[in-house]
Amino acid sequence: MSKFLSQAALNTLRNTRLGSRQLVRSFAGIASTRNHSEPARQEEVYGQARGRSLLQMRMPVAGRRSMFIQTQDTPNPDSLKFLPGVDVLGKGNTYDFPNGTTAHSSPLAKLLFRVEGVKGVFFGADFVTISKQEGAEWSLIKPEVFAVIMDFFASGLPVLHDAQPNADTEILEDDDETVMMIKELLDTRIRPTVQEDGGDIVFMGYEAGVVKLKMQGSCSSCPSSIVTLKNGVQNMLQFYIPEVESVEQVFDEADRMVDSEFERFEKNLKTLKQQEPSGGGPQ
């Protein structure tokens, strides 16, 4: 089949009247734990030193204007979305840093991983999603994250150095019609809704009727991610593309190994602290 016919099929998807959020929600059959009709909670912060306090004020950025940092809850209680009011990666772009060892290409990600309790960092078009370690308190993490984001955007440094945002849904010359339609549907109907929840879905491949996807950001460890993937994404893909038989979640084994090593290190550190004598003087 010619590329022109494939493009016609893609245009049909683009012209579908039902919006992306309605489609994903209706196919999933579940409501998000966050009320999307409510505006983001606005956290206005101001600081001068590293030990800054959280106040209801404006923060001058680069001597030009004030920065308002907003936060939005996500379906994952261990992930929080921060909106600095400026572009982070630009429209449609995302980048995932599941752990500190992957942050070498981003000065901002490196700084955020230095905040105690931060487990993962995810960049979107105009937001930063922070995932915290289990047991860590947002009340302690949020002020530090606010400070890092403000200081960084005041510095004028690039968010990313050499790495490029995800291009997994870019149409390639050797893509067949089914793959092209999967990519188009993911890019125009599914990913925008997932990104609103502070995460992303990355296309990893298609073979023998199985679409392989990787969850990122707040979606990677969200309790409802499997339900969303199967009941929402899979049903939508099957509705438009009969060739799709199922959807599978793909995990990065390297990321799993790093997370496992980090958790073991954390446990050893806690054990050592518990073994330290609590008395003030020599026994």
UniProtKB/Swiss-Prot annotation:
Keywords on record: Iron, Iron-sulfur, Metal-binding, Mitochondrion, Transit peptide
Entry binding sites for [4Fe-4S] cluster: 219, 222
UniProt record similarity statement: Belongs to the NifU family.
InterPro entries, sorted: FSCA_dom_sf, Nfu/NifU_N, Nfu/NifU_N_sf, NIF_FeS_clus_asmbl_NifU_C, RNA-helicase_DEAD-box_CS
BP term (GO), one: iron-sulfur cluster assembly
Keyword Metal-binding part of the UniProt annotation: yes
A GO MF term: iron ion binding
Keyword Membrane: no
Highest classification ranks of the organism: Eukaryota, Metazoa, Ecdysozoa, Arthropoda, Hexapoda
Name listed for the protein in its UniProt record: NFU1 iron-sulfur cluster scaffold homolog, mitochondrial
Transit peptide: 1-30
Intracellular or extracellular location(s): Mitochondrion
Pfam families assigned: Nfu_N, NifU
Cellular component aspect of the GO annotation: mitochondrion
Functional description taken from the UniProt entry: Molecular scaffold for [Fe-S] cluster assembly of mitochondrial iron-sulfur proteins.
Main location: mitochondrion
Region entry NifU, spans: 182-250
